[in-house]
């Protein structure tokens, strides 16, 4: 408060003198002479020092001049953002005629507050200060909605700044791409008078980030045909696209292009690491290893890319070998290896020993990602005891209540069948975001507790948490698994007007499943064939085919299988299901022909298996391969003993006897 009064008194004291001809400061001359106050300002490193320099500037009668004030505001707003309050004070009280530099400085400083940014821009227009390209760039950075960027776009056109080169053109394309409006971005790009390599890169990178790899590649070929030479950013995006598409042929071509460009490109670590990642995404671990060995320089990211790549492919032996060779390991290295062993269902003791080596021997502190990796492994393999051990670690590390971890724990307990424990985790979570609510609703859905899921969905909205499209999918799944047809239809029909989401393929799939489970196959078929704005997925035709398994509608079953085979000809499920439907209605000839067609196309039935977690770890029992189990003789003896104990009490044990033999 005292400081504010001091500034105001200083302003009154020097207000009349600022207009005096004898004390008028010449900013050009003073800049050339390197005024001592400005020199001191550049060397400030604390708030108190800044106040002292400000007092000096007031003492030397520079407070009303534009240049020193612009330096003061820039220093307090940008160089040391913690002094933003002082910058605002100086701007409001001591800058009667701010120039474009001062306005840009303030707009940049308050970019986290959209309202303040646009308020400053309005003030700028009122004071007839012409904005430049930096002004519009800062405004776009503060914008979060498409409508705001479009308004800024209009102001840019009116200002004539688009004629100053490609800088603003590229910025507009970038922001439209980031907001997901590819149509407008493409139109802006098409109207650019002279697009350069940066312009093409903005489009290609935007497509690659959003997963539109084919569009990115098409634009790259247009760029080359227009005679524009790609740079390292273009090549980096191409490698990302090759990985997304698993296009090893194109990936090798890009690799060759890098090598032909010489050491400037081939020794670029960012490109080399992207190359390794691309090969792993194309499942070419041998080529990745060869490229890695050829690298003259390797950083931590290079080593981690190799470990993560082998983990993704399930080759834990190779991942461990690379891990052991690492000159230095960070948290990412340990997390990747822990995730790999957990996901593969390795012995719990192996995972725990690795965790203790990480925390006790190497003194690496685990984070949320570490815990989620361990929890996900327990969830995927149904290892409840391992999941409880990880839950204990979460509590001991004082991570309890974190929404991210709580969501993973809820998922784990639900998949292990302990829904009560999952609900307890949900209730004790101190942070409840939309992901946490969605996880609990999903768990209730898959346990057939549809009414509870709907009640929780209602409570979520009462507490002011806005559901997202994943939440709505979980609610539809809950209705489907519990036979709540009308409730599910109500949620689906109000997705747009009440929640602001257009139904996507997954939502339509859940709706079709809901109707099929309720026996309303004709309605489901009508939605798939006539009412959907997108192509039906295999899960939709699979739901319709499953609904016909009673044999009442053979024609619909045949239609569903025909459409299903167009989408996934290599899968055996449709063949087996239709064959069983024919058998149900006594059409054995058609049943046999369906099986023959399956064999003729080279489609093989994948053997099912069951998993049991024992003291020694995870055991898998594959159908028709029980005798290959290492302890089959012991298992058979115990089954025979159980059979002998049960036989005197039950009459219908013929089937069990056959299975044991």
Curated annotation (Swiss-Prot):
Residues 540-615 are annotated as: Type E motif. Pfam families: E_motif, PPR, PPR_2. GO terms for biological process: RNA modification. One of its GO terms (cellular component) is mitochondrion. InterPro entries: E_motif (IPR046848), Pentatricopeptide_rpt (IPR002885), PPR_At4g14850-like_plant (IPR046960), TPR-like_helical_dom_sf (IPR011990). Keywords: Mitochondrion, Repeat, Transit peptide. Residues 1-18 form a transit peptide. PPR repeats lie at residues 99-131, 132-163, 165-195, 196-230, 231-265, 268-298, 299-333, 334-366, 367-401, 402-432, 433-467, 468-498, 504-539. Residues 616-647 are annotated as: Type E(+) motif. It is found in: Mitochondrion. The keyword Repeat applies. Its main location: mitochondrion. GO terms for molecular function: RNA binding. Belongs to the PPR family. PCMP-E subfamily. This is Pentatricopeptide repeat-containing protein At3g04750, mitochondrial.
